[in-house]
Amino acid sequence: MAKAIVIVGTLDTKAEEIGFIRDFIERKGHKALIVDGGITGSTPLAPDISREEVAGAAEKTLADIIALGNEGKAIATMAEGAAKIVHALYSTGSADAVISIGGSMGTSLGLAAMKRLPIGFPKLMVSTIAFTPLVTADAIAMDQIMMQSPVDLWGLNVITRRILESAAAAIVGMAEVSEKILVEKPLVAVTTRGILKYVNWIKPMLEERGYEVVVIHAVGMVGGKTLETVVRHRMLCSVLDLCTGEIIEEMNGGALTAGPDRLEAAGQIGIPQIVAPGSMEFWHW
C-alpha cells in the first residue's frame, strides 16, 4: 500500500533538494506531500500546501509575517503554522511519515512540525546544524532521527545527492513498516538512573500480574521529559517514579534537568503515580 510522506521545507531556498526527495519517494511508489514554509522569493516547485496556507494556520497572512521584519520571529510563526498542518494531516490519517531538511531556519521549521507528533510516528530531520548548540534537546521530538549533513544544502552535488538519497530511503523504509502503536497490556513506566536492583525485582513481578513495563532512563530531556510525554500521550496506566534526581538537577542548574514540569503529567492526566526520592544525592553540571 502506498504511503503518504510529508516533506517540510522552505521552497524559496531548498526547492531543488526538496524536489529530489519528492522524486525519490514517488519512484518508490509512495505519495509526497510538500509543505512550504518559505516566506519570500519565488519557487519553481509547486507545493501541496502553500506558504500562504501555512501562514494562515498560524492565524497570520504572509504579509503580516513579512512585516515583522525579523527573520527569527517570521520563521517561528511559520513553524507554528507548519506544526498545526502536519499534526492535522496525522490526525486525519493523511500522513504516514514526515521528513524535513534545512539550515538554521529550516531546522527550526522542521523540528516544530515534528514536535507534536506521537512516539512511533516516523520523523527525520536532515540539518546542517544537527549536532551544534543551536539545536537543544527540548526542541527535538523524543524518537526523532537527526541526520547531520556534512555540507551545506545549497543545491545538488555528489555529496548532497547521497545524503538526501539516504535520508529519503530511510523515511520511506520507516513509513513502509510503521504501524500505530497498540497498547495490548496495561503499560507501567518505571524510572531509573543506573540503579538496577529494584527494577530487577519490580519488572518481573508486574509482568507476572499481566502488566507490560517500560523503563525510563531518567537523564533529563531524553529521560524524565520522555516520561512526561508518554504520559500525556495516554499510553500508560500508572507510573512508578522511583528515580527523581532530575528535580535536583532543575533546582541547581544541573545538566540533566527534565524541565520545570517534571512530575506533573500523571496528575494532570489522572493516572496513579508513586514517587520516591531515588538518585537525589547527586547532580551534574
Predicted regions and their residues:
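Cap/lid and interdomain-hinge subdomains that line or gate substrate/regulatory clefts
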Residues: 66-67, 134-192
